Amino acid sequence: ACLVGSEMCIRDRPKRLINFMVVVGKSEDSATRLLGDIQAELEHNQRIIADFGKQQGNASWQDGEFKAANGVKFLACGRGQSPRGLRDREARPDYIVIDDLDDDELCRNEKRVHDITDWVKEALFGALDVGRGRFIMVGNLISKNSVLANLTKTKGVHVSVIKAIDKNGEPVWREKWTKEEAQEYRDFVGYR
C-alpha cells in the first residue's frame, strides 16, 4: 500500500499466498515422495531460484516436512492420518493438495470409501485456516466408487475434467503420447 496524499509512503511486503501447505497421498510414504518433488524443485530449479531466490531453509529441511527460506511450511500427510491441530506458530494450513488418494483396494470397499470421504470433508477440510484456505484434489477417476467420485458430487465443489484424448481423438499431452499410443491405452483400459 502506498499513501501519497500526506507525502508519506508506506510500503508493505506483498502478502504470501501460501503460508502452510499440506500434501496428502494414499500413504505417508507417497505423500513424502510427492512433497520431495516440490522440495527438489525449490532446491534445483534455476528458474524458481532466479525469480524467488534460494528457498532451501537453514533449519529443518528434511523429507516429509520442511520450511522454505521465505517461511512457507510444507508437510506430508497420509490418508487417514489426523490433521487436526496442525499449525506452524500462528499459521494453520491454508493450502491442502490431495494427489491420488484412491487406489484399487480402497475402491472395492464401499464402507472404506465412505469413511475416507468423511475424513476428507470433516478432518482434512476442517484443518484449513478458516476463510483463507484452498483445497485441491487431483487424480484419475479409477472407479465410480471412489473418494474422488464422491467429492465431485459435493455441492460447492468446482470440478475440472481433463481428458487424455480431445474430441478429435488427439492426445491432449502431445509431448508424451502419440495419437496411436493414446488410442491403444484407451482401448486396453477403457473409459470410466
Regions found by a protein language model. Give the residues of each.
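Conserved catalytic network of the ASCE P-loop NTPase/AAA+ motor domain
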Residues: 1, 88-90, 127-131
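Single conserved hydrophobic/aromatic residue that forms the stacking wall/gate
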Residues: 1-5, 10
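Post-Walker A helix-loop "phosphate-sensing" segment adjacent to the P-loop in P-loop NTPases
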Residues: 11-18, 43
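Conserved nucleotide-state-sensing and coupling region of NTP-binding domains
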Residues: 20, 24-82
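A structural signal for short, well-ordered beta-strand segments and their strand-loop junctions
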Residues: 22-25, 75-76, 97, 136-139, ...
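Conserved RecA-like ASCE ATPase "motif II neighborhood" in helicase/translocase motors
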Residues: 64-123
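Non-catalytic, compositionally simple segments
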Residues: 104-192
